[in-house]
């Protein structure tokens, strides 16, 4: 049976995390903007899994979550590459020694692109829950 409360709980967190991603972009904390995009998408996929009445397993890989929620076949290769890129920022972004290495390729434009990508995918995923 579909548990709309559980699904909505995840989606409420998505909005908060996307707002945080935008705030991090504005303050120049670009790696954290990207990290929050990963968090937003992870929670959105888990919200979709809850909506589909599927088990929510404790994983953070966005491609795997797309598979589990049966939407991966609708995502093109560039989208999957972005999911893979964002998945790298889950735990690594939290460890100081990795921050410098991970930050190298993150410019303001890159962070903005991931925010736009995440917002678009979140909108699309949310439409699957109507």
Residue ranges: model-predicted function:
Residues 1-130:
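Terminal alpha-helical segments
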């Amino acid at each position: 049976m579909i548990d709309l409360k559980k699904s909505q709980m995840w989606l409420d967190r998505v909005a908060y995390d996307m707002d945080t991603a935008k705030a991090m972009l504005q303050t120049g904390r670009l790696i954290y903007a990207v990290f929050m995009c990963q968090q937003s998408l992870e929670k959105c996929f888990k919200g979709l899994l809850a909506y589909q009445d599927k088990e929510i397993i404790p994983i953070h890989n966005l491609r795997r979550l797309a598979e589990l929620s049966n939407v991966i076949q609708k995502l093109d290769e560039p989208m999957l590459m972005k999911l893979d890129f964002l998945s790298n920022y889950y735990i690594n972004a939290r460890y100081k020694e990795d921050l410098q290495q991970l930050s190298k390729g993150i410019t303001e434009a890159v962070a903005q692109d991931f925010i736009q990508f995440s917002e678009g995918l979140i909108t699309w995923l949310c439409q699957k829950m109507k």
